Amino acid sequence: MDNQLHFCTVDEAVEEIRQGRMIIVTDDPGRENEADLIIAAEFATTEAINFMVTHARGLVCAPLSPERADALQLPLMTSVNRENMSTAFTVSVDAAHDITTGISAAERSLTIRTLADP
């Protein structure tokens, strides 16, 4: 297994995601100067989510198209967005079934996969 750090093209990154691999995406130092762990929802297993919360220690977010957010009736978190980068967060959600607190890696995984399931 190749554990060497390397940067790939966008097409290569998309293929990695398609194959079920988690990737690291970095942004411009002039923006937030951070990195995000990204995995396709269908591969967001308990183990993958546990890795994210253990090693990245940030928010676990699930990007949605405006159409999908509307279909799920998920409003924006705030009507006036004062966030520095104008990130369009919706209200926080958990899956409607088979969830207790929603905080465990297993329940977060279920919620992410549910959000992506049309």
Which ranges hold each PLM region?
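Catalytic domains of riboflavin
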Residues: 1-118
